[in-house]
């Protein structure tokens, strides 16, 4: 069974959050169209996401394992287990949906903490002395980032404002995921638009995006 991993990043409950509202609508429609997908969800602002610490890293900067792991305290072992569980779950997925609000031209810090957990040498990326390369090109995968924002940013300046979208595009491409889509829920705080209209406009784009996000049964040889 294929897996759809849905990551929402907002302290607000779903009914108050534009990004979560659009994210829910997307994943519900996606699973209706493709029932062979198992939906896995994380509301990471309301779950425990570890912050990386030197105690959990070996001399190469990798998550500890083997004897280094055995030397950890019981509590630190649980933290490392959680980090590895999040990473392994990410590797096992096929389609990723990340819904978040724009904060200071980026995204809430909890999302960066999550990304730090899933970017691991030997699992999602291969790091050598000369280069680093992604390991997630082993099968077709796709990512959709749903970003809500109070304002509306014309394309001519969007690249200067949407640093969060740009960062996520770059980091996932570096991991080997080449199919990347975005859904901007803009104008939530603009008087002539507002949350309701911004969400409705985003809803109108969902069906087309679902077709783009579906992945084939292709495994890299």
From Swiss-Prot:
Keywords tagged on the record: Flavoprotein, FMN, NAD, Oxidoreductase
InterPro entries for the chain: Flavodoxin_fold, Flavoprotein-like_sf, FMN-dep_NADH:Q_OxRdtase_AzoR1, NADH:quinone_OxRdtase_FMN_depd
Cofactors: FMN
EC id: 1.6.5.-, 1.7.1.17
Cofactor note text: Binds 1 FMN per subunit.
Catalysed conversion reaction: 2 a quinone + NADH + H(+) = 2 a 1,4-benzosemiquinone + NAD(+); N,N-dimethyl-1,4-phenylenediamine + anthranilate + 2 NAD(+) = 2-(4-dimethylaminophenyl)diazenylbenzoate + 2 NADH + 2 H(+)
A molecular function GO annotation: oxidoreductase activity, acting on NAD(P)H as acceptor
SUPFAM superfamilies per UniProt: Flavoproteins (SSF52218)
Annotated positions binding FMN: 17-19, 148-151
Protein family (similarity comment): Belongs to the azoreductase type 1 family.
Subunit: Homodimer.
Summary of the function given for this chain in its UniProt record: Quinone reductase that provides resistance to thiol-specific stress caused by electrophilic quinones. Also exhibits azoreductase activity. Catalyzes the reductive cleavage of the azo bond in aromatic azo compounds to the corresponding amines.
Protein name in the entry: FMN-dependent NADH:quinone oxidoreductase 1
Gene: azoR1
